[in-house]
């Protein structure tokens, strides 16, 4: 699963809508901010799975055509993996560019996405890797991975669903393994519009992410909030230092 790089949860209800322009033209053409009341926010969060399946081919084409401005955090994640590591990509979308880059470095990838169309693209592009149609909020495998990432996917979940993901992260990450996810720079919700369809985003406060990581056995390695060098993404990179409960 992917998301429009230009829209972050810093754009909350009550903020004046953007005119759709952006200093990064490849981002601006993907999505424009669009604003709703609280009830619509809840509906928007519940429609994410259907949204990505409906627009899977268009979104995949747009993502592949856009410049990969958020590559540095992915590269940093990769440098922390042991040789031959197995990586779980939650919300993998069509596999380009993130899963394809990780696979090209010689790592084993298990990609999970709720969109059958997106997973079909992954299977065509990288048939030697493992691809699963599932919702990250409920998927379980009984396996632990050396690396787990939820990039441009986690922040499509509502606040409570985001909180519930941390025990899942812990259960999926091997001791000493690395976790990477991105969200927004502050607590909030926003709904953008992709091809005329509402597209929901949410974020908790950075301090709450830090607490959730700590409480679920992770040690924070790095975080960045909206830095241009990281494609203006806000991300958290952490290592599992305590084995999750069996």
Predicted regions and their residues:
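Acceptor-substrate binding/catalytic loop of class I
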Residues: 192-208
């Amino acid at each position: 699963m992917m998301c429009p790089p230009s829209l972050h949860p810093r754009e909350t209800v009550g903020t004046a809508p953007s005119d759709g322009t952006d200093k990064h033209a490849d981002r601006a053409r993907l999505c424009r901010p669009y604003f709703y009341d609280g009830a619509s926010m809840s509906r928007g969060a519940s429609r994410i799975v259907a949204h990505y399946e409906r627009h899977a081919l268009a979104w995949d084409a747009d993502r592949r055509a856009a410049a990969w401005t958020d590559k540095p955090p992915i590269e940093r994640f990769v440098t922390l993996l042991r040789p031959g590591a197995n990586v779980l990509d939650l919300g993998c979308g069509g596999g380009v560019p993130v899963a394809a880059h990780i696979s090209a470095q010689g790592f084993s990838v298990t990609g999970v996405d709720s969109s059958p169309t997106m997973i079909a693209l992954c299977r065509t592009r990288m048939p030697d890797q493992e691809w699963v149609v599932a919702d990250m909020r409920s998927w379980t495998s009984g396996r632990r991975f050396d690396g787990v990432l939820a990039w441009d996917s986690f922040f499509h979940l509502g606040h409570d669903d985001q909180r519930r993901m941390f025990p899942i992260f812990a259960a999926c990450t091997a001791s000493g393994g690395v976790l990477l996810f991105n969200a927004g720079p502050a607590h909030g919700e926003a709904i953008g519009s992709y091809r005329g369809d509402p597209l929901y985003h949410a974020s908790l406060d950075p301090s709450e992410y830090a607490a959730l990581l700590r409480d679920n056995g992770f040690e924070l390695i790095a975080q960045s909030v909206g830095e241009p060098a990281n494609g203006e993404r806000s991300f958290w990179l952490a290592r599992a230092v305590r084995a999750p409960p069996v």
